[in-house]
Amino acid sequence: DLYVVNRDQENALYRNDLSDSGPFTEIGCALSVANTQIGQAGAWADYDNDGDLDVFLANVGANALYRNDGGTEFVNIAADAGVRQSGSGWLTTAAGWADYNGDGYLDLYLASGGDEQFQPDLLFAGNVSGIFADSTSSAGLPTSVTAQLSAGWADFDNNGSPDLYATNGFGPFGPGNRLFRNNRSADRFLRVLVRGKGPTANGANLAAIGAQIRLIDAASNDTVAYQQVLPRTARVRTVESEGVTGAAAEIIFGAPAGPYNVQVKFPG
């Protein structure tokens, strides 16, 4: 499916139906995600660990966090969750999800600022309550004002924990692009590498785009976390499988206790 973020007009959510009458149906209004703010970016993730994808919308002005209630309705809970950031002139340019502290709940990094509006970037820690806490300083990230264009999470040093890369939009007038290494112990994380067999082997696409990964408690058989390989945010690592070297999508779960089982469902 495809979510399109617009400026000064309704956003659109296109459901991929793969039908004879046309592959996509616009359902943004029907599911209450046709936000009309000045949109900057959207970021999908299952922040509440209920097995479906929610979406954070970065805006000029008030941000939105749409909780997915079973695929039939989205509810904007940004204010209650503490991530609305609706102050005068506030500009959020991008957002990225990762469980940086390995507690089993996804955290949210917001890249902020613009041409004439320098602002601090923010890291919000998720928890069981669903209310995010500002952990920018406690995580060791700078709280100075800047203007960031984007941010992304990936394990660049291969130590098992997600690291953060933030891009600066003002060249010599700003701090430059920044790479923050996550020093938390790898035993708090579980890494899953996912790769499709490809169309020549009648399998899923090699990049595993669309694959659904569930982390399951081995004792209770309950799903405790869910992630999906998405095209814009998929992290890729080179691996060898069955004598063939190629790219695989990397999914990192915060896994503070175990044991766990992992279920992977490929598209198609």
Task: Please describe what each predicted stretch is.
Residues A139-P142, N158-G268:
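Gly/Ser/Thr/Pro-enriched helix-cap/hinge segments flanking short amphipathic alpha-helices
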Residues D1-N6, D54-N59, L108-G113, L164-G169:
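Hydrophobic beta-strand segments that make up the repeating blades of beta-propeller
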